[in-house]
Amino acid sequence: MKPVFLSSIFASLVVASIAAASEPAPERQKELVRMVRQDCGSCHGMTLNGGLGPALTVEALKERDIPKESLVATIVGGRPGTPMPPWHRFLSESEADWIVDRLIEGFPQQ
């Protein structure tokens, strides 16, 4: 095999393994959905339509046009001086990223 071909295969495997590592395991995904529905829902509304905290629906997020990285940082680090707590003790940054992806595409019911 040619070195360029082998390099391409290796690069593809590395990218695939990084993508797989950032996706939580199916059981953890269920835990994260429950966490968002119950814990985040206590401020953002049980249907994420808003309450003490702003709405987290697809429409609301599009309207506010907040960069994804900012949403992840808010989940992980909270917002000092507001009721939004940091969640870094309960989830990783990659899990927060997964949550934001789900919010942007429409959060699952279960």
Model-assigned labels for residue ranges:
Residues 7-16:
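Bacterial N-terminal signal peptides
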Residues 52-57:
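Short cysteine/histidine-rich zinc-coordinating motifs and their immediately flanking basic loops
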Residues 26-49, 62, 70-77:
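Sequence/structural segment immediately N-terminal to covalent heme-attachment motifs in c-type
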Residues 49, 108-109:
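Charged, solvent-exposed alpha-helical segments that act as regulatory interaction surfaces
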Residues 6-7, 35:
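Short amphipathic alpha-helical "recognition" segments used for binding
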